[in-house]
Amino acid sequence: MDANHDKVVESGSRGGRGPVRTICVFCGSRRGNRPSFSAAALDLGKQLVERELDLVYGGGSGGLMGLVSKTVHDGGRHVLGVIPSALLPEEVSGETLGEAKVVRDMHERKSEMAKHADAFIALPGGYGTIEELLEIIAWAQLGIHNKPVGLLNVDGYYNNLLSLFDKGVEEGFIDAAARNIFVLADNAGELLTKLTEAAAAAAAAVEGGDGDQVDGEATAAAAGLKRKRS
């Protein structure tokens, strides 16, 4: 395990055992073809502001990243954008919003975002978004962090990925408990509520509680977060 992973572990105690204060959002540097994707990004930003949550994200000024970050920043919440130096010309145009941190590479970007986050949300996006989502799920499965992960499945965007996960369980490559290591919703309000419940369930699991006050999906996610893989 490398030094960046160690940093995530060190900060992980805040994510699983305390209130969710900062959300890391993975999403596309493009807006996609459907208006519903942009609408979901704007709604997520508004929900973060209403719930007094801060944002850490990939630092881009365009696409869904730009919509979420501008909404959160304009709403008076703290925004931290983390971007590799090589991507500055491609993903940043015009004025950056909030605090910007330039890092060396993609690996440092993910570790830095994870270090500052208490929970994670993936909106629709391309290869980069999917890679970030899968790595943060893998880190949870391996016990590198104990922070809840949420998938905002706008218009069924991630349905095929979810089917692939089911296939992995069916063929014996993914443990059945790990299939429920994240929470899922098709709207931001419901997903943020589930993430908060998953964080509470994870805290109860760590402290020896039974998690009875949260719903079954959150408890399943907490159980997945608690279990470590070899």
Curated annotation (Swiss-Prot):
BP GO annotations: cytokinin biosynthetic process
Keywords: Cytokinin biosynthesis, Hydrolase
GO CC entries: cytosol; nucleus
GO molecular function: cytokinin riboside 5'-monophosphate phosphoribohydrolase activity
EC number(s) per entry: 3.2.2.n1
SUPFAM superfamilies per UniProt: MCP/YpsA-like
InterPro entries assigned: LOG (IPR005269), LOG_fam (IPR031100)
Binding site for substrate: E91, R109, K110, G126, Y127, G128, T129, I130, E131, E132
EC class name: hydrolase
Stored Pfam families: Lysine_decarbox (PF03641)
Reactions performed catalytically: N(6)-(dimethylallyl)adenosine 5'-phosphate + H2O = N(6)-dimethylallyladenine + D-ribose 5-phosphate; 9-ribosyl-trans-zeatin 5'-phosphate + H2O = trans-zeatin + D-ribose 5-phosphate
Family membership noted in the UniProt record: Belongs to the LOG family.
Protein's recorded name: Probable cytokinin riboside 5'-monophosphate phosphoribohydrolase LOG4
Gene name linked to the record: LOGL4
